[in-house]
Structures are given as C-alpha cells and as structure tokens.
Amino acid sequence: MKSILITVAAALVVAASPGYAAGTKIQSTESGKPHMEFAPCPAKGRLRLFVRSGEIRIVGSDEARLSIDLSGRKSGQIQDVKARLTCSENSAELHVTGGPHNDLTITIHVPKNLDLYARVPAGEVSVEGITGNKDVELHAGELTIDVVNAKDYGHVDASVYAGEVDAEAFGDNKGGLFRSISKTAGGPYHLHAHVGSGQLTIR
C-alpha cells in the first residue's frame, strides 16, 4: 500500500517545476512489501535515517531514488514493516519501523553522494559505498563503516562506551571502556561514529 501526501500549494509548484520550492515538503509511505521504492529526492543534501533495531545495511547507489529491500528467513512476516520518507528541497528523512527483529535484513539503497545521518537502537549495522559526511550512532551491537577512501576525511571521531574501536582505515585500534579515536587531516569530509556497547569497525 502506498500513500503520498502533498499539500495543495506543493502540488501546484511541482506541476509547474521539476524541482522543489523553498519550504516544500513531500511525504510518502510504503509498507508490507519486500521491495519498497520512492520517487527521487534531491541527489545532493542531507539524508537522516531512523531505523528500528535489527540487521541493517545502508548502501550507496548511483540512483537518485531511495529503495528498501527486505530479505531473510522472516521476509514473509513483513506486513507491519513501514517506511515513511519526507523530502524537501535539499534534504530527506526516512523512518523505518515494524516487522520481526530477528532473521530479517533491511537493505536501504541511498544516493551515494548524500551526507548521511543515521540512528539505530541496536543490531548489526553496515554502511558502504557512500561518499560525503557521515554521522552514525548505534546504541548496542556491531557497526561497520566502509569509508571508501580514508584520504577524503578531514576529521574523524570514533568511540565506544564499552567494546572495541577498530579503525583500520586510519591505522588505529582500541578496546576497553570509553575508547575513542580522533584524527585530523586535509580531506573535505567529516566522520562521526559511535557505539554505546559493542564493536565499531571503520575500514
């Protein structure tokens, strides 16, 4: 089931122009399908993700649109999985809720050149193939971030309250309580990564 909520003013603007007017927001919702696809959001800007706990893969794509694939042993029990995307002129926000927390992999395909902000309560999370700034936090579990090219980053801060930080991309590794790694270089991007309890890997 798909529903798109568009204000009358926004509809008039979209009809007259292929872009987004300042202040315009368009919201769409998908639910209960193994593949969910949304109309393209701006290819440049900031993407904010808020995803329920579980096995989550965030993957950069050459496509301008966002899409979600659900797979795993419980992929037949996804009736209450819901994804809500809100788009504006230069940013997007995606919320994913519902569904079984075990034996289900949620793969979120996003434009690879968006700055990424992501929050997940718990689980196994991976981020790959995305250039640009990254701000990713996981309360508990395993977080793996593929930085593509370490030389692209001007500032890096990575930390865990309890567990291990393995920042092999930047030549550092620390384990124990309140572990953190901070690097400053000449690249254009910023990386912030934090795990409350668990494993943080940056490669």
Language-model region placement:
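Exposed beta-strand and adjacent loop surfaces of beta-rich binding modules
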Residues: 46, 65-67, 80, 115, ...
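Short, surface-exposed interaction patches in beta-rich subdomains
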Residues: 27, 31-42, 91, 97, ...
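Short, T/G/N/S-enriched strand-turn elements that build extracellular solenoid repeat scaffolds
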Residues: 35-38, 55-60, 81-84, 105-109, ...
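Active-site alpha-helical segments that house and flank conserved acidic catalytic motifs
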Residues: 47-50, 118, 136, 158
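Short acidic/polar N-terminal linker immediately downstream of export determinants
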Residues: 5-9, 18-65, 73-76, 99-109, ...
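A mature extracytoplasmic/lumenal domain signature
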Residues: 51-53, 60-64, 70-74, 98-100, ...
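Short, hydrophobic/aromatic-rich segments at coil-to-beta transitions
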Residues: 65-67, 88-94, 116
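A glycine-rich, hydrophobic loop/mini-helix early in the fold
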Residues: 81-100
